[in-house]
Amino acid sequence: MSKFFYSSPNELDTEHQNENHNNQEPRLQSELLSTGNQVVQSPPLTERLHEWRNLLIHQYNVVVAEWSNLKSATKNEIDSGREYINRNVLNDPQENNRLLVPSSILSLGAFFCGRVLTNKNNWGYRSIVNRNPSILGRLLTSLPSRTVLPLALAGVVFNQLTPGTAKNACHTFERDFLSESFVQEYHRIWDQLYVQGIKQGSGQIGETFQNSLQNGIKSIRESISAINDDKKQ
């Protein structure tokens, strides 16, 4: 059996010669350009720089593609939101052209008025030691009042000036963002407390006051007529 199991002695000599030839290759290479300039470069370093350059270009292209996709998706979301608002909320041309901007400005002013009314510095809370707020000041500067009152004033002003847009906004919010059971319960409580309670009670009080006023005026007129008749007689 031969001593050289995997290869013959000639093959081993050839491999050693190739390795020696590769080791003897120069690590710097000179090249003469067409302009007459001579460039000296290292082939391994040049190859490595080409690899880094290609990798950097690839990463740049990936980032540019991702950024383009993100811009396109953001633009589509903005366009969809604008179309959704125009279709469901801002669908009254008269209010959009004439009343929407003034109503928004006045609603913002009402919001800041609510912030002023609920500011503690306007109701005697000057310092920790010297505090003398009134009952109305305590009521208006409470946490629920500071949270609800500015929004309520802004909502009332916006509803009075642009009722169609305000109604569409409330209906869209209830339909698309709240559960149906919660909306039904909310409307039931609202009807029970406000429509059938406060509103109906205030209407009855106003009607009673109006009837009393008319009866009083009628009795005064009858008295004046009776006095005039007595004077004529």
Curated annotation (Swiss-Prot):
Nucleotide-binding listed as a keyword: no
Keywords, comma-separated and alphabetical: Membrane, Mitochondrion, Mitochondrion inner membrane, Transmembrane, Transmembrane helix
Residues in compartment: Mitochondrial matrix: 118-138
Origin superkingdom: Eukaryota
An annotated GO cellular component: mitochondrial inner membrane
Chief subcellular location: mitochondrion
Similarity-based family: Belongs to the apolipoprotein O/MICOS complex subunit Mic27 family.
Full protein name: MICOS complex subunit MIC27
